[in-house]
Amino acid sequence: GLVGSEMCIRDSSMEPGEEQPFSQYSIQVDAEGFRPFTVSGIELFSKQLSLQEVRMDEVDAPGNPVDTIVIPVNTLWGDFPPKIAESEIKPISETGEIVLSRVVVPEYVVVHDGPPNDTTARDYYVRYKDYIKNVASSEIYSTWPDATLRANILAIMSFTLNRVYTEWYRNKGYSFTITSSTAYDQKFTYGRNIFQSISDIVDEMFQNFLSRPNVSQPILTQYCDGERVTCSNWLSQWGSKYLGDQNYEAIEILRYYYGNNMYINTAEEVSGIPASWPRVDLTIGSTGEKVRQIQEELARISRSYPAIPTVTPDGIYGPATREAVEVFQRVFGLPVTGVIDYRTWYKISEIYVAVSRIAELV
């Protein structure tokens, strides 16, 4: 871990101003048998513990290992596009898709590192808690009052879980959970440092989200900085800081912005990346987005399990898809039917997450 430097004036993170409220450092890590690893732009605040994780690749690691990370500045200081307004509750019937039957905290989210339609951007498989810590460390200052940090983290988590619950991007034909674009979602920076004060709160509260009465989905709690960009009925990041200074509790801060009928709710944890089963078995003749999704997952799995034939993700369940499903079922000890039922759907999802995660770590 990296300990905050006293060179930085603590008060400059307490109100907007001309002085950058954090110092920035670079580190290089060297270890015998591993490629050198460099991180630049690590942010340090006075009296704050900053934590930097480094994953090093062996010298002869295959592929194209990442060995340099450049961390952009916090969104409160830097110039990032403002959030494009959306409705906070999604009309599920619009897509005709069955969404997740309950609110869950996924083990992993898939983060698309760019705007949704940027096909060159990488997708990262990130543990949910690590994702929330990363976003909060990118969006707000760790020096702020505890209640302010909690209110902002709750808004970040509820926003994320709405994307998970509604399968927002999957239903638009994408294969990720959320993007790193501030115009569409929230700031995420692969490999950035996080802050102990934020990390501790996320570890304590990660199963929470924000609810309104008689609404099953987590609320898409949008927010803005409140200084350069103002937003009615959304949380103001700087405004929430001033309310924290006035000893408002986290829920009081949230109700100040989102209204008095906002409540803190609790979700259950699940493993992997949840994606809803279409409620009907997929078999020869089935077509559509769910078929294409499962074909993409099988295609990725077949790279790690070559016995499974490669399928073309065309959204049509033909003989080649049935054959791939039969081999998958045989390999993983399921009844060999060539039909994707509930058990097979979730087993494919589980194995897909596992092989994708291993690829991220290699």
What are these regions (language model features)?
Residues 2-8:
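Short, small-residue-biased leader/transition segments that mark boundaries at the very start
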Residues 5, 24-362:
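Conserved, single-site charged/polar hotspot
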